[in-house]
Design a protein with these regions (language model features):
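Structural signature of tandem-repeat unit edges
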Residues: 1-48, 54-70, 80-93, 103-116, ...
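Homeobox/homeodomain signature
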Residues: 40, 52-54, 58, 98, ...
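Consensus positions within tandem repeat domains that build extended binding/scaffold surfaces
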Residues: 72-75, 95-98, 118-123, 141-146, ...
Length: 191
């Protein structure tokens, strides 16, 4: 994502500009101007935000468009047929609940461009067996992988400093966790 200077002058203007820079929330304006791909996945007009997969989304494998920078909150929420997703290196943010209840999702590689894993990002992805967390990630959010019942092992890279509350709670198959010395904060019921 390119650097952008935001001046704090008018509070309304400031909030609007901050939303454009870093927000993973979908706005009414985003939806009004959205474009839809052949699989009924909506993107912002400029292609930088993946907004939402439609309720009729039934793909087993999906490749996020190159140039996408943000996978918004709830983007693939409850897409029960999704088994595999390819995320390009252009993505810097994965929003809250982005893959919430994607019960068929089996594996995911998070690109080196992502710096944090948001709250509930992969909550209850019950078929998720493997996750690759890159060295760019510094924090793992609350409930990020909670109820990923098939997850067997996880290696947390040296870049991570905090693991949120319930991040890996109810991961019943989890047998091995490697936590580096860089982690200074582990939330309640993290494992």
């Amino acid at each position: 994502m390119a650097n952008k200077t935001v001046e704090k002058t008018n509070p309304d203007t400031f909030l609007k500009e901050m939303n454009e820079v870093c927000c993973t929330k979908v706005t009414e304006e985003d939806l009004k101007d959205a474009i839809e791909d052949e699989y009924r996945v909506m993107y912002s007009r400029d292609g930088k935000k993946l907004l939402k997969a439609s309720f009729s989304f039934r793909k087993k494998k999906y490749v996020v468009r190159e140039g996408t920078e943000v996978i918004c909150d709830d983007a693939f929420r409850q897409c029960g047929s999704l088994q595999s997703i390819t995320i390009p290196n252009s993505v810097t943010s994965i929003g809250d609940f982005a893959f919430y209840l994607c019960e068929s999702l089996q594996s995911i590689t998070i690109p080196n461009s992502v710096t944090s894993i948001a709250d509930y990002a992969f909550f209850s992805c019950e078929s998720l067996q493997s996750v690759t967390i890159p060295n760019s990630v510094t924090s793992i959010g609350d409930f990020a992988f909670c109820r990923c019942k098939s997850l067997q092992s996880i290696t947390i890279p040296n870049s991570v400093t905090s693991i949120g509350d319930n991040a890996f709670w109810l991961c019943k198959s989890l047998q091995s966790v490697t936590i580096p010395n860089s982690v200074t904060s582990i939330g309640d019921n993290a494992f």
